[in-house]
Amino acid sequence: MMQICDTYNQKHSLFNAMNRFIGAVNNMDQTVMVPSLLRDVPLSEPEIDEVSVEVGGSGGCLEERTTPAPSPGSANESFFAPSRDMYSHYVLLKSIRNDIEWGVLHQPSSPPAGSEESTWKPKDILVGLSHLESADAGEEDLEQQFHYHLRGLHTVLSKLTRKANILTNRYKQEIGFSNWGH
């Protein structure tokens, strides 16, 4: 009985969620031989945004369907909005995989003037987060904060994994090899 429960919890662990995502991105990377073919090809899969992940008190993760997300163009539009092409998704998914595997690399201290990087500073996000954390630290229990962020991480990893799998399958359809690997 104990082994069955442990196996169930392991199936829904953070490590397994990360491994599923990394595996899906590796599969995508091996399948997509010519990434430039992904440019200007829209990726619209609305069912991706209908998934939420619940993390139980013991840390177990359960996936369930919820109501559809807001329509594209709304204030809640994300990076994975249908207006982006498959190439943008491909680059982002590979970048996130690298961040998980190797850690977040530090940006150069002085990017070239006029570049897109010159307007964005990683410490800006950290300052905003530290302000929120200090305000919540006295009010919320650390365990509740942990479960909140764990739930969010599971949700994001689940959506990213599905997005990588969908991109792989769409690429196969676009080049005419829809039955590869099946």
UniProtKB/Swiss-Prot annotation:
Keywords: Acetylation, Cytoplasm, Cytoskeleton, Lipid biosynthesis, Lipid metabolism, Microtubule, Nucleus, Phosphoprotein. Induction: Down-regulated by fasting. Up-regulated by a carbohydrate-rich diet. It comes from the Eukaryota. Pfam families: Spot_14. It is found in: Nucleus; Cytoplasm; Cytoplasm, Cytoskeleton. One of its GO terms (molecular function) is identical protein binding. Residues 55-75 are annotated as: Disordered. GO terms for biological process: lipid metabolic process; negative regulation of microtubule depolymerization; positive regulation of fatty acid biosynthetic process; positive regulation of ligase activity; protein polymerization; regulation of lipid biosynthetic process. The modification N-acetylmethionine is found at M1. The modification Phosphoserine is found at S71, S74, S78. GO terms for cellular component: cytoplasm; cytosol; microtubule; microtubule cytoskeleton; nucleus; protein-containing complex. Belongs to the SPOT14 family. This is Mid1-interacting protein 1. It comes from Mus musculus.
